[in-house]
Structures are given as structure tokens and as C-alpha cells.
Amino acid sequence: MNTARLNQGTPLLLNAVSKHYAENIVLNQLDLHIPAGQFVAVVGRSGGGKSTLLHLLAGLETPTAGDVLAGTTPLAEIQDDTRMMFQDARLLPWKSVIDNVGLGLKGQWRDAARRALAAVGLENRAGEWPAALSGGQKQRVALARALIHRPGLLLLDEPLGALDALTRLEMQDLIVSLWQQHGFTVLLVTHDVSEAVAMADRVLLIEEGKISLDLTVDIPRPRRLGSVRLAELEAEVLQRVMRRGHSEQLIRRHG
């Protein structure tokens, strides 16, 4: 990992965090510590609590119980240090690419926006409209929009899910490269276990609102696609997910 990082990531500490929607318990007294600058991927079946966890960290929702901290400080108090990317790039079609990157900023921000676009390989598209961009290019703009704020925490909610296979691999490499350069903490939610293992330091499996697997990805970078160790770790996570699904089917069948 590159030690010459530009900024320090946000350390995260969740203590007995729960989130309820009426009688539905989505997160159930979840405990989690993520050191500053770590890249963590969260996987699991739909409805297990992955996106809810991300929304709590982004300040889009509040926990029913428990504490969400950045070190010893409530994360909500430093929310400006957090940026989030979604599957939809959410660009404003009536604003140019560079204006989308600088959205909400005041003062002399255009040079910083150009640097952010250069970092994602789009320095020559600054004056164009979002409609002229491919899906992968739109996500690069969304990434540049996050970078310009020099975040301590980058939250990724399935940002690559709608991309074709080659573009997806290119974006994976770009995100990892920028993470290594800048040192922010990353939390990636994905349904793609191979993506999680390829990108992250650590993979969490959330089931029924709790962390049921916390797996360290002990593979040096850069990682070689198709390596035996990557395949072994991917299989370990998938077997755990499938075992839980098989158990639920047996319960329904014999209950």
C-alpha cells in the first residue's frame, strides 16, 4: 500500500447499533470497528442490512439505538468529511461536467475540479454535457465530485452494478488506485463477491442485521485476477451465504 498518502482516513466505531422500521429489525446491535484508511466491502443477501448500514454512515438515516462514531466523535458532527457514490451517478443534465464536479462549492473551485477530473481520466471532457458520456464516464464524474472534497470516508453503494464487465474492472482499478493515493476510508456495498474480494482489505457478510463473517483479504496488491487465493476467498464467502440460504429453505420446507 502506498505510504505517501494525501490525507488521513476516518476511523469508524459502531457500538451496539440497531435500526428498526416499525417491527422490522434491519440492524441488530451491530458492533464494528474500521481503522482509518481501511478498504472494507460489505456483502450479503438483499434485505440483510447492507444499504441501511451505509445510509446510517452517510447521515441519511439515524440509528434506533447505539453510537456511530468517527474515533471518539459522533460521525454526524463531521458529516462534511463523508462522500457517497450510488449506482446512478446522479449528475444534473443541465450542468456541464465540470459544474457537476463543483456542485455546491463556492469561491475558486474550477482548478480543483479540473485536477479531480484529471485524476479520473476525464480532463478533456470538462465542458461537455452529461448526456454525451457513457455510463462508466458518468461514474468517473461522480468519483471526481467526491474527490474534490478530499473526503476522509468514501461510501460506495453498488456504484459499478450497472456497468459492463470491462468498464467495471477499469473502475475497480481506478477506485483502488485513488484510495491508495489519498488514504480515505472506504466502505463498499456490493452483491458481487468477486468484486469485494478483489478490491477490499476486509469483507463483511451481514445477515439478519448482524455481521456473520469478518474476513481479512490477505493478498498483496496489485492483485492478479484469476489467482488461486482470490478464488479461495470468494468461495469461502459464497459458501457461507449459500449455506444460510439452504438452511432457510429447509426451515420453510419442514416448519
UniProtKB/Swiss-Prot annotation:
ATP binds at residues 44-51. Keywords: ATP-binding, Cell inner membrane, Cell membrane, Membrane, Nucleotide-binding, Translocase, Transport. Its main location: membrane. One of its GO terms (cellular component) is plasma membrane. It is a peripheral membrane protein. Its EC number is 7.6.2.14. InterPro entries: AAA+_ATPase, ABC_transporter-like_ATP-bd, ABC_transporter-like_CS, ABC_transporter_ATP-bind, P-loop_NTPase. SMART domains: AAA. One of its GO terms (molecular function) is ATP binding. Residues 12-233 form the ABC transporter domain. It is found in: Cell inner membrane. It catalyses: ATP + H2O + aliphatic sulfonate-[sulfonate-binding protein]Side 1 = ADP + phosphate + aliphatic sulfonateSide 2 + [sulfonate-binding protein]Side 1. Part of the ABC transporter complex SsuABC involved in aliphatic sulfonates import. Responsible for energy coupling to the transport system. The complex is composed of two ATP-binding proteins (SsuB), two transmembrane proteins (SsuC) and a solute-binding protein (SsuA). PANTHER family: ALIPHATIC SULFONATES IMPORT ATP-BINDING PROTEIN SSUB, TAURINE IMPORT ATP-BINDING PROTEIN-RELATED. NCBIfam families: PRK11247.1. Belongs to the ABC transporter superfamily. Aliphatic sulfonates importer (TC 3.A.1.17.2) family. This is Aliphatic sulfonates import ATP-binding protein SsuB. It comes from Shigella flexneri serotype 5b (strain 8401). The gene is ssuB.
